[in-house]
Amino acid sequence: MFKEFKEFALKGNVVDMAVGIILGVAFGAIVKSLVDDLLMPGIGILLGSADFSNLFLVIKEGATPGPFTTLADAQKAGAVTINYGLFINTIVNFIIVAFALFLVIRNINQLRRMTEKPPVEEAPTTKDCPYCLSAIPLKATRCPNCTSELKG
């Protein structure tokens, strides 16, 4: 059983998939930092809110009544919140990852198209019988289906 697992785990596609997942997680962390630390503060300043991650709506007060200045304060008090600022950050994160993935796949597809050989058109090997319209070999002098004699 261990031998079978070892064969499975060391196959090329399994190893490639594992490397892809690890790189994907690392890339996701980079994009998250890009969104949280570089993009969203700038967008927040332009839109008048310095930090999108602290945009929330209190649905139910917690042990300590509000108003709360940060999401952490609301959560510490036990308030139930809708965290739409974090959701906006997540959407921006997704858009960046999706766009980066699109660019990678587009480039891979372009490389594949460059390396593909154009399809070779083969000469036809059959023709249609003029009497019964069945496909017959090009060199046939008589149709095997309707037994008509064929000219030339």
Swiss-Prot record:
Transmembrane spans: 14-34, 39-59, 85-105
InterPro entries for the chain: Mechanosensitive_channel_CS, MS_channel, MSC/AndL, MscL_channel
Cell location: Cell inner membrane
Keywords noted in UniProt: Cell inner membrane, Cell membrane, Ion channel, Ion transport, Membrane, Transmembrane, Transmembrane helix, Transport
Source species, domain of life: Bacteria
Molecular function GO labels: mechanosensitive monoatomic ion channel activity
Lipid bilayer topology: Multi-pass membrane protein
Keyword Transmembrane attached: yes
Keyword Membrane part of the UniProt annotation: yes
Cellular-component GO terms for this entry: plasma membrane
Free-text function comment from the UniProt entry: Channel that opens in response to stretch forces in the membrane lipid bilayer. May participate in the regulation of osmotic pressure changes within the cell.
Record-linked HAMAP family: MscL
Quaternary data: Homopentamer.
Recorded family membership: Belongs to the MscL family.
Record's protein name: Large-conductance mechanosensitive channel
Gene name of the record: mscL
